[in-house]
């Protein structure tokens, strides 16, 4: 065991040679390096695989009951202060290491083909390797200073990855938005770290927890100050994990390449905030009110993320809001003190969401063979449909990932989400009702995404788009105005400004380009990689893009089994419970580790029924009528309800506009913060230029004229001296006369 632990130092730095060598090679041998650029994927995968092997070995040691803290080096500032750099390997670290390495390897393999035609291929792999380095360093940190250093590096990597295609203005704006939003959280994190150092005098987790618990027990610390410092630490996690109200950067982060989205949402950036709260949970549990704040932010984020996902047309943005909502479940579990359930859902959600994002990348890849490189079209679910005939493997993988996220047994997310919902009933019935309702919303919008993408016909190629008036069917959404809809070449898209009462599909139209393959700046040439044949229809991705999907399907099927309590009789296969021993659980303090299968099945039936209800509603509303005309009469009977629908239309229209406009939160920030700061900046600039500079320049000008006057008088001319003498005498004489 000691032989294994002495090599743990290589974990955070094993990948460091990759970005360094890529940079050096591009400087000294640019042409040769670019000619063999795909060779650089191999060392990235190889080194990360080595780290993965170490991670699994360490995890086995953790399951067997070991914990390790390895001291590395110490930097002594003076006799009273020294800073220690170290590695902390415990159950939380080993879980995060496995998540980062397994998902990271699959994303790198996937990216080799996905980015093969991009001019920034080498830069992409350098950024990805550096991002993995930062995250590995973060989860192995033994103190708050190391956490903050790698925390900032994770933020820098996210800035570089989100803005990878920086020549696109929307991508450049997205990375700036993510960076600025996270600056708010990072500032709070730094203040919180300094506050707890002022209280305890230590950055090390072991000493920090021990000293702080003693101070709380002896009532030797100011409660308000402690709550403030803990809240500031939590603000850092709120920003990094896209929790309300600092979630606004997450949907815009989808402007980066899809493999980046998979990595950020599954194993790196958004997981960093969850990791921070989990790492500091022994600190938070003894602070009044802070756990309530964490759970409150979690439940708000759950509901907000689910409602904002309802109207998304972009497939990646829909998955982004799904991530936001699912991270809310994890934050809720941490706030309730259900440590095991939180980490369980972190594991299952990571693999399911990686599967969905890589699946969406395969979908986008296939759509680009028709519409060219145009994210507004290749990622638009309204322009998809019927893809199950063209990408059957991707369809199956995406379908299983969708079922998992919906909480359908026996897939992974069912076990973890159900555990969180069951614990929420013990914590707060109101929170439990919201969590259960959101589970139904999750099933609704995820199946909406699936149906719009794979069912029906490929909308871009429908004959009805030729302009012929051949269709008089009603809108496929029941929430539009009464009347027939003729489908023309101008495709009906959702709009923000909807004054006519239309809902999910407005009659305001936006013409599609006649030649969608002409691109001003093509990043990717859409051809089949083997025979250079251009496709006029979607096609399945290559094998090295499908292989990670199949592996993630296996994870989605079986990773949930690590948390299923099989401890019946002589069986003791609850791996996660042994992995997390000792575990924090404020809701089951008197538990004897027994498991009531009857209670579990009863609660599961309720949650699964809600999920199936959401799936049914989604299927009823979004299953295309072009492929299921037998339901057309029923649909038209709802559409023709006449005046009874007016109030319902208004309600749905308000909900739709609220969801489509992201709850008006971005608009509020734009008005209340951005414009206010701009006005304050302009006033400050005016005050600086006119008042501060005016005083300084006024003194200079006055001195200049006084000096010029003195210089003129003292020019050596007798007449000037005589004039000054007589003028002075006259002044004194007048003053004397007045007095």
Swiss-Prot record:
**One cellular component term from this protein's GO annotations in UniProt:** chloroplast thylakoid membrane
Localisation per UniProt entry:
Plastid, Chloroplast thylakoid membrane
Q: Which residues cross the membrane?
A: 9-29, 40-60, 89-109, 125-145, 147-167, 185-205, 224-244, 258-278, 283-303, 327-347, 354-374, 396-416, 425-445, 546-566, 605-625, 718-738
Write the record's keywords in alphabetical order, separated by commas.
Chloroplast, Membrane, NAD, NADP, Plastid, Plastoquinone, Quinone, Thylakoid, Translocase, Transmembrane, Transmembrane helix, Transport
Give me the reactions it catalyses.
Answer: a plastoquinone + NADH + (n+1) H(+)(in) = a plastoquinol + NAD(+) + n H(+)(out); a plastoquinone + NADPH + (n+1) H(+)(in) = a plastoquinol + NADP(+) + n H(+)(out)
What's a Gene Ontology MF term here? Answer: quinone binding
UniProt topology in membrane: Multi-pass membrane protein
Q: Which Pfam families match?
A: Proton_antipo_C, Proton_antipo_M, Proton_antipo_N
**In terms of domain of life, where is this protein from?**
Eukaryota
Quaternary organization: NDH is composed of at least 16 different subunits, 5 of which are encoded in the nucleus.
Per the entry, what this protein does is: NDH shuttles electrons from NAD(P)H:plastoquinone, via FMN and iron-sulfur (Fe-S) centers, to quinones in the photosynthetic chain and possibly in a chloroplast respiratory chain. The immediate electron acceptor for the enzyme in this species is believed to be plastoquinone. Couples the redox reaction to proton translocation, and thus conserves the redox energy in a proton gradient.
This protein's name: NAD(P)H-quinone oxidoreductase subunit 5, chloroplastic
Q: Which gene encodes it?
A: ndhF
């Amino acid at each position: 065991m000691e032989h294994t632990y002495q090599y743990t130092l290589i974990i955070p730095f094993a990948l460091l040679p990759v970005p360094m060598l890529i940079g050096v090679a591009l400087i000294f041998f640019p042409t040769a390096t670019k000619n063999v650029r795909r060779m650089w994927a191999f060392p990235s995968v190889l080194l990360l695989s080595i780290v993965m092997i170490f991670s699994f070995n360490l995890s086995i040691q953790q399951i067997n009951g070991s914990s390790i803290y390895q001291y590395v080096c110490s930097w002594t500032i003076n006799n009273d202060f020294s800073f220690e750099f170290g590695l902390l390997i415990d159950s939380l670290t080993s879980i995060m290491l496995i998540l980062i390495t397994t998902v990271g390897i699959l994303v790198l393999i996937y990216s080799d083909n996905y980015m093969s035609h991009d001019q920034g291929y080498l830069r992409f792999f350098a950024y990805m390797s550096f991002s993995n380095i930062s995250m590995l360093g973060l989860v192995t940190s033994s103190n708050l200073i190391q956490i903050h250093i790698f925390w900032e590096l994770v933020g820098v990597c996210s800035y570089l990855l989100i803005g990878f295609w920086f020549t696109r203005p929307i991508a450049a704006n997205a990375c700036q938005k993510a960076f600025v939003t996270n600056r708010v959280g990072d500032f709070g994190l730094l203040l919180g770290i300094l506050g707890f150092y002022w209280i305890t005098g230590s950055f090390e987790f072991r000493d920090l927890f021990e000293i702080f618990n003693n101070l709380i027990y002896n009532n030797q610390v100011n409660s308000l100050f402690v709550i403030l410092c803990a809240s500031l630490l939590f603000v850092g996690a709120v920003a990094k994990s896209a929790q309300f109200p600092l979630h606004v950067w997450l949907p815009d982060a989808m402007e980066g390449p899809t493999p980046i989205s998979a990595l950020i949402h599954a194993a790196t950036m958004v997981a960093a905030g969850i990791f921070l709260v989990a790492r500091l949970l022994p600190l938070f549990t003894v602070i009044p009110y802070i756990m309530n704040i964490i759970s409150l932010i979690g439940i708000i984020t759950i509901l907000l993320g689910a409602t904002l996902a309802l109207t998304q047309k972009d497939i990646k943005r829909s998955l982004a809001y799904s991530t936001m909502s699912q991270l809310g479940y994890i934050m809720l579990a941490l706030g309730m003190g259900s440590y095991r359930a939180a980490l369980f859902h972190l594991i299952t959600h990571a693999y399911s969401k990686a599967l969905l994002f890589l699946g969406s990348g395969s979908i986008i890849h296939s759509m680009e063979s028709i519409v060219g490189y145009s994210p507004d079209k290749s990622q638009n679910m309204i322009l998809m449909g019927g893809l199950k005939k063209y990408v059957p493997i991707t369809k199956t993988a995406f379908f299983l990932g969708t079922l998992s996220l919906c909480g359908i047994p026996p897939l992974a997310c069912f076990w973890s989400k159900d555990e969180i919902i069951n614990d929420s009933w013990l914590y707060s019935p109101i929170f439990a009702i919201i969590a259960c309702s959101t589970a139904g919303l999750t099933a609704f919008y995820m199946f909406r995404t699936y149906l719009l993408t794979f069912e029906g016909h490929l909308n871009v190629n429908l004959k009805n788009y030729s302009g012929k008036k051949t269709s008089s069917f009603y809108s496929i959404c029941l929430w539009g105005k009464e009347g027939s809809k003729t489908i023309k070449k101008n495709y009906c898209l959702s709009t923000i400004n909807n004054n006519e009462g239309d809902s999910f599909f407005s009659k305001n139209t936006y013409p599609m380009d006649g030649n969608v393959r002409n691109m001003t700046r093509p990043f990717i040439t859409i051809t089949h990689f083997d025979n250079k044949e251009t496709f006029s229809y979607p096609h399945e991705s290559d094998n090295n893009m499908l292989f990670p999907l199949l592996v993630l399907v296996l994870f989605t099927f079986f990773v949930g089994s690590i948390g299923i309590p099989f401890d019946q009789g002589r069986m003791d296969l609850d791996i996660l419970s042994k992995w997390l021993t000792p575990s924090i659980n404020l809701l089951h303090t008197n538990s004897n580790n027994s498991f009531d299968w009857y209670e579990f099945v009863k609660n599961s039936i309720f949650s699964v029924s809600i999920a199936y209800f959401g799936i049914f509603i989604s299927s009823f509303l979004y299953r295309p009528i072009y492929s299921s005309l037998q339901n057309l009469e029923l649909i038209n009977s709802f559409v023709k309800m006449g005046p009874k629908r007016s109030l319902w239309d208004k309600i749905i229209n308000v909900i739709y506009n609220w969801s489509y406009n992201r709850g008006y939160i971005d608009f509020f920030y734009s008005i209340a913060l951005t414009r206010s700061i701009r006005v304050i900046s302009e006033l400050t600039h005016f005050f600086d230029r006119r008042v501060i500079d005016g005083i300084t320049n006024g003194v200079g000008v006055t001195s200049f004229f006084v000096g010029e006057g003195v210089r003129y008088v003292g020019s050596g001319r007798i007449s000037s001296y005589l004039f000054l003498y007589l003028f002075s005498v006259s002044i004194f004489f007048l003053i004397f006369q007045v007095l």
